C-alpha cells in the first residue's frame, strides 16, 4: 500500500504588495468584498465601498503601512515567510506552503504548489489561534472553492483553531515572562484581540469565547490574578457595535484612572502586522500615555520564534 504524502498549508489574512495607495486599494477591495468579512447587502455595500471607502481609506492606510514596512516587504509577509521556511526546515520531508486569503501568495497558488509536490493529503493550519467565521471561515470557503474546480481532490485535515493548545499557551507565557524580566512587571497585562461585529457573535460565532479561553489559560500559566489581566478588542471598523471593551477606550480610561505601567500583548496575531506594530505599539501607546499613563510596552507576536515553530510542528503532527 502506497504511503500517503502529506503537505502543510499555512494560511493567513494577507497584505498589500506595496505601501502605495494603488496596492492598498487592490488589497482592501478584495478583503472588504468577502461576505465573511462584511455581510451587508451588496446593493448597499458596493457603492459605499467603491465610491467612498476605497478612495478615502487607501491613501491613509498606505501611509500607515509605509511607517512599518520592512526591507523585504510588509511585516506580515516577512514573518509569515520566516514561519514557512522555519517549519519546512523543522519538517524536512514535508512540503510547506504559505497562502493568503487576500493578496498574494493566494490560497489557490499554495494548493497548486503542494499538488505539484504530489501530495495526496493537505493539513491546513489557519494561523488564527481563536476561530472566527470572518477569518478561519474565509479560509474554509476559499479552500472549498479551489477544490471544487479540481478533478482530483486531496485528503484535507483542517485545524479549526488552537486557542487552548498547551504549546501555544506556554509560548505566550514565556514571551510575557521575558517582557516582564526586561521591563519589570506591569500594573496590568492587557490582552488585545482583533474585534468582530457583536452581531456575528450573537449569531453564533464563538470567537469571544475562544478569546476568553486563551486569556484564562494564559493567566493561569503565568500565575497572575484575574485583576492584573484584562481582555479587550481592537481594530473596529464601521458604525455597528463590535465586541467590547474596546482597546483604545480602555487604555484611555486606565491612564485617566492612574494606572501607571501597562504591557500589551495581542495573542490572536500569529505574526506582527499593521494592527500590532502601528495600531497597538504606536497609536495606542500615545492614547495611554496621553491620558496620564507612565510606561507602556508592546509584547511582540510569536512570529518565527523557535517555540512558535515547535508549536506548529506539534500541532500538525497529529494529522500527518
From Swiss-Prot:
Disulfide bonds: none annotated. GO terms for molecular function: ferrochelatase activity; metal ion binding. Its main location: cytoplasm. GO terms for cellular component: cytoplasm. Pathway: Porphyrin-containing compound metabolism; protoheme biosynthesis; protoheme from protoporphyrin-IX: step 1/1. It catalyses: heme b + 2 H(+) = protoporphyrin IX + Fe(2+). Fe cation binds at residues 194, 275. PROSITE patterns: FERROCHELATASE. Keywords: Cytoplasm, Heme biosynthesis, Iron, Lyase, Metal-binding, Porphyrin biosynthesis. GO terms for biological process: heme biosynthetic process. It is found in: Cytoplasm. It holds the Pfam family Ferrochelatase. CDD domains: Ferrochelatase_C, Ferrochelatase_N. Its EC number is 4.98.1.1. Belongs to the ferrochelatase family. NCBIfam families: hemH (TIGR00109). Catalyzes the ferrous insertion into protoporphyrin IX. Monomer. This is Ferrochelatase. The gene is hemH.
